[in-house]
C-alpha cells in the first residue's frame, strides 16, 4: 500500500476510534456513576524510505476521567453517594469482583440487592435482605432492616456494603462499564 494512503488511513481510523469514545460518553451522560473515557493520540514517524515529514497517528491509550460528578439528592432510601475515591463492589457477569460508582441500589423479588443488574457484594458475598422488610443504609455502609411487625426501633443489621478506596489509575475500565484491578485480585474493604 502506498505510504501516503497508509498514513491517511491511520489518521482516519484513529479519528473513528475517538468518535466512538465520544459517542459512548454522550450516550452515558445520564448514567449514574458513569466515568467518561479519554483518548490520547500520539504522532509517530513512519519508518522506512521517504521523507521524514510522513507521520502516522496512534492511540496512546484510553484513560478515565476520575473527577467527582455532582451529587444528586433523590430522597430515596436505597440511593447512596460515594466519596471521591470510593467504589462499590459488585459481582460481574463472570462471577468475579468488580467495582462501580453507581449508587442506585435495588432489591429484587428474591431479596437480592443489586445495582445496574449486578449483585452487590458485602462482607460475605452477595447481599440479600428479607422480603418485605424496610431497608436502611448507614453512613458507613451498614445495611439494616426492619421486618414487618417489628417496632420502629427494631432494626437488625444484615450486612455491610463493600466499599473500597481506589486512587485514579489503580483500576482498569472494562467493556461492561465496571472497573477491575490489573491483577484481578479483589481490593480490601475500607
Where are these regions (language model features)?
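Amphipathic alpha-helical polymerization modules
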Residues: 1-190
Amino acid at each position: 500500500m502506498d505510504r501516503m494512503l497508509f498514513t491517511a488511513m491511520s489518521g482516519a481510523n484513529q479519528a473513528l476510534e475517538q468518535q466512538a469514545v465520544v459517542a459512548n460518553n454522550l450516550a452515558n451522560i445520564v448514567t449514574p456513576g458513569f466515568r467518561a473515557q479519554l483518548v490520547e493520540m500520539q504522532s509517530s514517524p513512519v519508518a522506512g524510505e521517504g521523507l521524514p515529514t510522513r507521520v502516522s497517528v496512534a492511540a496512546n491509550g484510553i484513560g478515565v476521567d476520575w473527577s467527582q460528578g455532582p451529587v444528586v439528592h433523590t430522597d430515596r432510601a436505597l440511593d447512596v453517594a460515594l466519596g471521591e475515591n470510593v467504589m462499590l463492589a459488585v459481582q460481574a457477569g463472570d462471577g468475579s469482583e468488580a467495582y462501580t460508582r453507581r449508587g442506585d441500589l435495588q432489591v429484587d423479588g428474591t431479596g437480592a440487592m443489586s445495582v445496574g443488574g449486578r449483585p452487590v457484594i458485602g462482607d460475605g458475598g452477595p447481599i440479600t435482605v428479607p422480603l418485605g422488610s424496610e431497608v436502611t443504609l448507614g453512613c458507613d455502609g451498614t445495611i439494616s432492616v426492619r421486618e414487618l411487625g417489628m417496632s420502629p426501633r427494631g432494626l437488625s443489621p444484615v450486612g455491610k456494603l463493600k466499599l473500597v478506596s481506589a486512587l485514579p489509575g489503580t483500576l482498569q475500565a472494562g467493556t461492561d462499564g465496571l472497573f477491575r484491578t490489573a491483577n484481578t485480585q479483589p481490593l480490601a474493604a475500607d
